[in-house]
UniProtKB/Swiss-Prot annotation:
Annotated function: One of the early assembly proteins it binds 23S rRNA. One of the proteins that surrounds the polypeptide exit tunnel on the outside of the ribosome. Forms the main docking site for trigger factor binding to the ribosome.
The species this protein was found in: Leifsonia xyli subsp. xyli (strain CTCB07)
Gene Ontology CC: ribonucleoprotein complex; ribosome
Gene: rplW
Full protein name: Large ribosomal subunit protein uL23
An example molecular function term from Gene Ontology annotations: rRNA binding
Family: Belongs to the universal ribosomal protein uL23 family.
BP GO annotations: translation
Subunit and interaction comment: Part of the 50S ribosomal subunit. Contacts protein L29, and trigger factor when it is bound to the ribosome.
Length: 99
């Protein structure tokens, strides 16, 4: 079960600003960077409480950080988790609502 005592702003880190995520907005789908330890239920509750919208579904994907060469050998970017949130109705203005 989801931890209800988590702050929603600790679950949702930032909206993803990319060409692909903008294309999904027309379908009512919004993409967010989320805490890698959070589950779909926590993400749904966080989106509903922050933006005051009704969520239909949440799809998540884990992205592995790339390995990069540095002056000191190999380094690795951190792993990230993204959530694609589909709304039942309404929309989110991601440029003014977050902050």
């Amino acid at each position: 079960m989801a931890a209800v005592n988590k702050d929603p702003r600790d679950v949702i880190i930032a909206p993803v600003v990319s060409e692909k995520s903008y294309g999904l907005i027309d379908e009512g789908k919004y993409t967010f960077l989320v805490d890698p330890r959070s589950n779909k239920t926590e993400i749904k509750l966080a989106i509903e409480s922050i933006f005051r919208v009704e969520v239909a579904s949440v799809n998540t994907l884990n992205r592995q950080g790339k390995t990069r060469r540095t002056k000191f050998g190999l380094g690795k970017r951190k792993d990230t988790k993204r959530a694609i949130v589909t709304l039942k109705s309404g929309s989110i203005d991601i440029f003014t609502a977050v902050g």
